Regions:
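A recurrent domain-boundary module in secreted/ectodomain proteins
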Residues: 359-371
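An edge-strand/N-cap motif at the start of beta-rich repeat modules
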Residues: 17-47, 53-56, 62-63, 327, ...
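Conserved core positions of repeat-based scaffolds
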Residues: 30-33, 42, 80-83, 92, ...
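C-terminal outer-membrane/trafficking sorting elements
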Residues: 375-453
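Positively charged n-region of N-terminal signal peptides that target proteins for export
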Residues: 1-4, 452-453
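Sec-dependent N-terminal signal peptides
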Residues: 4-13
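Short glycine/serine- and acidic-residue-enriched loop/turn motifs that recur at repeat junctions
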Residues: 44-61, 94-111, 144-161, 194-211, ...
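Tandem repeat domain/solenoid detector
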Residues: 36-39, 69-73, 86-89, 110-111, ...
Length: 453
């Protein structure tokens, strides 16, 4: 007689987080995080391997990438990803037709691929189709598309390996947009280069630059973020500045007029963090509250509406927002307790909540596979359980994908089915123990505990 498994909707527990993700990065329609144990996780759009899991299958929940425990930082571009390990090595994967991975080819990669042999990489920024990085010696490097001079090497020639930009050894931070780059030196000066059609370089003109150009004379710039065609920055006194395109109010100055030089906005409280997406911006004030402004077509501002905002708008008065990441049309944020939140566009599962439903407000994303909220497909029958060799699945609905995950959240097996009726999965070679079977159907997802004997 068949042993049938009762299908349970696994509810979300707010007490299960402890410290989970400590670093986050959102790209075009994909997301990444590094956990406290140094593991790397990815989810969302994956058509060119930008998740790094060796497939081109989209994921709607965080999936561990490899088994390394020494990931240090990560940056996501439109369709490629960069990361640095604690040993100072540089890694890249995803789209590569313009050489933005930096491996000397123009071939896309579906798994993290080491770039060169240097062990002194310090920080990275993945732009739309190009990449920049700073080494521990303060040198600046860039590679990828260069049609607007966004690499800053004085040419408009694409590069498919990291190329040093100038000879300066005092670069502190760098940020890449669609086709422009902004950076800060250790002396607090601001620099920019690349496309300047909307004034996103901030030099008071709309003329593009093919090498780093100092912006103004201030020496107290502290944080920068290059959006698609606008820029935002903080000074060391906590003031917030913006410039460039303003069609959606992404500059936050109360207008929709482009500005080609840094312009201070909202001085009510010191700001401590800011980031920019395609046509919007996110920021955290010194009191830990979360704010946003700009384009809101998919709810990426997180205020519960689809209405664009041209001034900073309070999203959450909670006083423990710590890290933010703005992407093309979705947003990620971490609180100081390590809890992860996501909102905005979710067609490819880039929010990581196990669904493909857009979210208009910050939605908590559990890092524990034991507590993922799912839909229930009542037609599903899974047997036998416990299982020795083959798990059988019966469903009246179309089953797209099955995924088997261990108790640590690691993906063990992923299978594409694209059919209804009877399915089977052979797990004879699995070690004995508890696993979670995620079944993605046309009406939603189910996560089922299975015991391998």
């Amino acid at each position: 007689m068949k042993k049938l498994l009762v299908l349970l909707i696994l509810s979300l527990s707010l007490d299960s987080f402890s410290q989970c993700f400590i670093k986050i990065a959102s790209g075009g329609d994909h997301s990444h995080g590094i956990k406290t144990d140094g593991t790397l996780w990815s989810w969302g759009y994956n058509s060119l391997g930008q998740l790094g899991d060796g497939t081109t299958v989209h994921k709607d929940m965080p999936s561990q990438i490899g088994t390394s425990l020494n990931w240090q930082c990560i940056s996501a571009g439109i369709e490629h990803t960069l990361a640095i390990k604690t040993d100072g090595t540089l890694w890249a994967w995803g789209r590569n037709d313009y050489g933005m991975l930096g491996d000397g080819t123009n071939l896309s990669k579906q798994i993290p691929t080491q770039i060169g042999t240097s062990t002194n990489w310090q920080s990275i920024s993945a732009g739309d189709f190009f990449s920049t990085a700073i080494k521990t010696d303060g040198t600046l490097w860039a590679w990828g598309i260069n049609s607007s001079g966004q690499l800053g090497d004085g040419t408009t020639i694409n590069r498919n390996v990291p190329t040093q930009i100038g000879s300066a050894m005092n670069w502190q931070s760098v940020s890449t947009g669609f086709s422009h780059t902004i950076a800060i030196k250790t002396n607090g000066t601001l620099w920019a280069w690349g496309s300047n059609y909307y004034g996103q370089l901030g030099d008071g003109t709309n003329i593009g630059r093919i090498s780093p150009t100092q912006i103004g004379s201030a020496t107290n710039w502290q944080m920068i973020s290059a959006g698609s065609t606008h820029s935002v920055a903080l000074k060391s006194d906590g003031t917030l500045w913006s410039w460039g395109e303003n069609n959606y109010g992404q500059l936050g100055d109360g207008s929709n007029i482009n500005i080609n030089s840094p312009n201070q906005i909202d001085s009510s409280l010191p700001w401590q963090n800011v980031t920019s997406g395609f046509y919007y911006s996110l920021a955290i004030k010194s009191d830990g509250s979360l704010w946003s402004w700009g384009r809101n077509y998919f709810g990426q501002l997180g205020d519960g509406t689809f209405v664009d905002k041209n001034t900073p708008t309070l999203i959450s008065s909670d006083n423990n927002w710590e890290t933010i990441s703005a992407a093309e049309d979705h947003s990620l944020a971490l609180k100081s307790d390590g809890s992860l939140y996501a909102w905005g566009y979710n067609y490819y599962g880039q929010l990581g909540d196990g669904t493909n439903v857009n979210k208009l407000v910050p939605t908590i994303i559990n890092c524990s596979i034991l507590n993922v909220s799912t839909f229930l497909d009542k037609s599903l029958i899974v047997f036998p359980n416990p299982v020795k060799t083959v798990v059988n699945i019966q469903s009246q609905n179309h089953v797209y994908i099955t995924e088997i995950i261990d108790v640590n959240g690691r993906e063990i097996m992923l299978t594409e089915h694209n059919k209804s009726g009877d399915l089977s999965i052979n797990i004879e070679d699995f070690q004995n123990g508890l696993y979670f079977l995620k079944i993605k159907t046309e009406i939603g997802n189910a996560i089922i505990k299975i015991l391998k004997e």
